[in-house]
Curated annotation (Swiss-Prot):
Cofactor(s) essential for the protein: Mg(2+); FAD; thiamine diphosphate
Record key words, sorted: Amino-acid biosynthesis, Branched-chain amino acid biosynthesis, Chloroplast, Coiled coil, FAD, Flavoprotein, Genetically modified food, Herbicide resistance, Magnesium, Metal-binding, Oxidation, Plastid, Thiamine pyrophosphate, Transferase, Transit peptide
Record: transit peptide: 1-55
Catalysis: reaction(s): 2 pyruvate + H(+) = (2S)-2-acetolactate + CO2
Binding site for FAD: 186, 246, 308, 331-332, 349-352, 371-375, 395-396, 414-415, 508-509
GO MF terms, alphabetically ordered: acetolactate synthase activity; flavin adenine dinucleotide binding; magnesium ion binding; thiamine pyrophosphate binding
Outcome of mutating residue 199 to A/E: No effect on catalytic activity. Resistant to imidazolinone herbicides but not to sulfonylurea herbicides
Chain residues that bind thiamine diphosphate: 144, 207, 487-488, 511-513, 538-540, 565-570
pH dependence: Optimum pH is 7.0-7.5.
Gene: ALS
Native source organism of the sequence: Arabidopsis thaliana
Protein's UniProt name: Acetolactate synthase, chloroplastic
Entry function: Catalyzes the formation of acetolactate from pyruvate, the first step in valine and isoleucine biosynthesis.
Protein activity control: Inhibited by asymmetric aryl disulfides, triazolopyrimidine sulfonanilide compounds, isatin derivatives, and sulfonylurea and imidazolinone herbicides. Insensitive to feed-back inhibition by branched-chain amino acids.
Length: 670
């Protein structure tokens, strides 16, 4: 075995929230999980006072539908600004048209430009209507899961809602992983599914699945449309729910006979969301924000713990850090909300976070948790997490406050508004406060020097960490990166220095393999001028490899950096550490020819007309990556990596900072 050399990379209770009171049982609650504030959609015209009963699925049966005209006089509808340009319909105002055409026009009125839709018997009418739209592009995935993940990539990279469409039965159920992923990672998504005709619902008709019931617990809300006249209101509500407050997925199930029925739409229907609107958190009170500033002034070792809830507040967060000098540790979902290469960045914390980020939390006396949910992959053993610190938790979702970790001070509200308010207080009191955490930062700098992110090189083998480091250098940290799930995902989080929000697209809460390639499709569609790279593992990549065909047909310049170690790397790492290296079905190659690369990923690319190359030696890697980046259009680079590599640092599940592992790999026994 070749001698190993080490390479190093250094990166620079008082609760003010109250639980919402239960809503009146007389009003339908079109939301089952969250009580949230909203942000207005500037693309929507104002509504009149006309109200229709909501058609929502019953908890007991998909065929039982609530059809009640609800009195909402006590809860005013939100006032929406008028669109700068009047929408011009291709239909005359009094011209009857199919429900499918009404649905497509409703999407157009929401400003939708792209959908990811795969046709089937129960959704054919929608696809026919899409062909009559001059403004909506359909990107045809090769699998419905690819479609929903692509819609997520579109939404995550742009901040706009992603739209996917599937047929009934298996088409709809193929969306399930994407809906669950969007819910856990707070991604705005509107999924539209075809359904069997109303008269067949509940009869076990061909390709009938009660998708509203199936997805009830993995969507922010869902609808079964039982009246064609409700389509304009339901679509407006779906987009509002998906994008307001804590974003999430909304599913709209449309029976085929509704799609075929002729009607004259009323575009002036008001949204009917009394329960949702009544549970909005109010803007943060100045007194609460001033108390947080006081806690900061009294602390000696504060640290910021920021998550996905800060992605829309990166400017305000940057100003807050500038005013306070507090170091920033990010969750996996929060990467990019603060530049990873800044001297005050501690990079990522948690199970595979940096030693110095976890050290900062362990030794802090004040933890400022903004837009986070205290996930188990971050906290480890809850009782030991930030045990010396006062905790301030700001989040838009009241359900997250105190769910896993009880804060000393909590504010349920928009992180952006809270940061703006605190920045104002800090600016006005700068001379009085004279914040100086230099001693604390020096202490953390010692930890950075002592425990930098590092990896070892063995002969000519290519360390996967090195491949990502080279990609970061050649793209100047400006590419949009998507990943699958596994070791490569963690290395991509560690060794690529994200400078801006929405550069990092990864399945965090659900951990869905197969996410990376279709997510890159969505990102490329939303950002046609950006460099989009799917950093993937061979296990994740092959789960949605069929989407190479979509990339080719749509002429998307998606690059794939495939870190191929022929194994399910993360599971194998746990086998090494906790199961005496007993291999339990984690080898993905051909057991009869273990020395051969199997399957040959280059042939998948060739079958879809995509240029591809393989690199096996470290000395050839930089040139190979540069060629990938310089080649117009899509490209696949198969990087053969040793399977013995481990993602380090590592805090075992349920462990504490004292359990952190910083050495070792699959080449030694445990």
């Amino acid at each position: 075995m070749a001698a190993a050399t080490t390479t190093t990379t250094t990166s620079s209770s008082i609760s003010f929230s109250t639980k919402p009171s239960p809503s009146s049982s007389k009003s339908p609650l079109p939301i089952s999980r969250f009580s949230l504030p909203f942000s207005l959609n500037p693309n929507k015209s104002s509504s009149s006072s006309r109200r229709r009963g909501i058609k929502s699925s019953s908890p007991s049966s998909i065929s039982a539908v609530l059809n009640t005209t609800t009195n909402v006089t006590t809860t005013p509808s939100p006032t929406k600004p008028t669109k700068p340009e009047t929408f011009i319909s291709r239909f005359a105002p009094d011209q009857p048209r199919k429900g499918a055409d009404i649905l497509v026009e409703a999407l157009e009125r929401q400003g939708v430009e792209t959908v990811f839709a795969y046709p089937g018997g129960a959704s054919m009418e929608i696809h026919q209507a899409l062909t009559r739209s001059s403004s909506i592009r359909n990107v045809l995935p090769r699998h419905e899961q690819g479609g929903v993940f692509a819609a997520e990539g579109y939404a995550r990279s742009s901040g706009k809602p992603g739209i996917c469409i599937a047929t009934s039965g298996p088409g709809a159920t193929n969306l399930v992983s994407g809906l669950a992923d969007a819910l856990l990672d707070s991604v705005p998504l509107v999924a539209i599914t075809g359904q069997v005709p109303r008269r067949m619902i509940g009869t076990d008709a061909f390709q009938e699945t009660p998708i509203v019931e199936v997805t009830r617990s993995i969507t922010k809300h869902n609808y079964l449309v039982m009246d064609v006249e409700d389509i304009p209101r339901i679509i407006e509500e779906a987009f509002f729910l998906a994008t307001s407050g804590r974003p999430g997925p909304v599913l709209v199930d449309v029976p085929k006979d509704i799609q075929q029925q002729l009607a004259i739409p009323n575009w002036e229907q008001a949204m009917r969301l009394p329960g949702y609107m009544s549970r909005m958190p109010k803007p943060p009170e100045d007194s609460h924000l001033e108390q947080i500033v006081r806690l900061i002034s009294e602390s000696k070792k504060p640290v910021l713990y920021v998550g996905g809830g800060c992605l829309n507040s990166s400017d305000e967060l940057g100003r807050f850090v500038e005013l306070t000098g507090i170091p920033v540790a990010s969750t996996l979902m929060g990467l990019g909300s603060y530049p990873c290469d800044d001297e005050l960045s501690l990079h990522m914390l948690g199970m595979h976070g940096t030693v110095y980020a976890n050290y900062a939390v362990e030794h802090s006396d004040l933890l400022l948790a903004f837009g986070v949910r205290f996930d188990d992959r971050v906290t480890g053993k809850l009782e030991a997490f930030a045990s010396r610190a006062k905790i301030v938790h700001i989040d838009i979702d009241s359900a997250e406050i105190g769910k896993n970790k009880t804060p000393h001070v909590s504010v349920c509200g928009d992180v952006k508004l809270a940061l703006q308010g605190m920045n104002k207080v800090l600016e006005n009191r700068a001379e009085e406060l004279k914040l100086d955490f230099g001693v604390w930062r020096n202490e953390l700098n010692v930890q950075k020097q002592k425990f930098p992110l590092s990896f070892k090189t063995f002969g000519e083998a290519i360390p996967p960490q090195y491949a990502i480091k080279v990609l970061d250098e050649l793209t100047d940290g400006k590419a949009i990166i998507s990943t699958g799930v596994g070791q490569h995902q963690m290395w991509a989080a560690q060794f690529y220095n994200y400078k801006k929000p929405r550069q990092w697209l990864s399945s965090g809460g659900l951990g869905a393999m197969g996410f990376g390639l279709p997510a890159a499709i969505g990102a490329s569609v939303a950002n046609p001028d950006a460099i989009v790279v799917d950093i993937d593992g061979d296990g994740s990549f092959i789960m949605n490899v069929q989407e190479l065909a979509t990339i080719r047909v749509e002429n998307l310049p998606v690059k794939v950096l495939l870190l191929n170690n022929q194994h399910l790397g993360m599971v194998m790492q746990w086998e090494d550490r906790f199961y005496k290296a007993n291999r339990a079905h984690t080898f993905l190659g051909d057991p009869a020819q273990e020395d051969e690369i199997f399957p040959n990923m280059l042939l998948f690319a060739a079958a879809c007309g995509i240029p591809a190359a393989r690199v096996t030696k470290k000395a050839d890697l930089r040139e190979a990556i540069q060629t990938m980046l310089d080649t117009p259009g899509p490209y696949l680079l198969d990087v053969i990596c040793p399977h013995q590599e481990h993602v380090l640092p590592m805090i075992p599940s349920g462990g504490t900072f004292n359990d952190v592992i910083t050495e070792g790999d699959g080449r030694i026994k445990y």
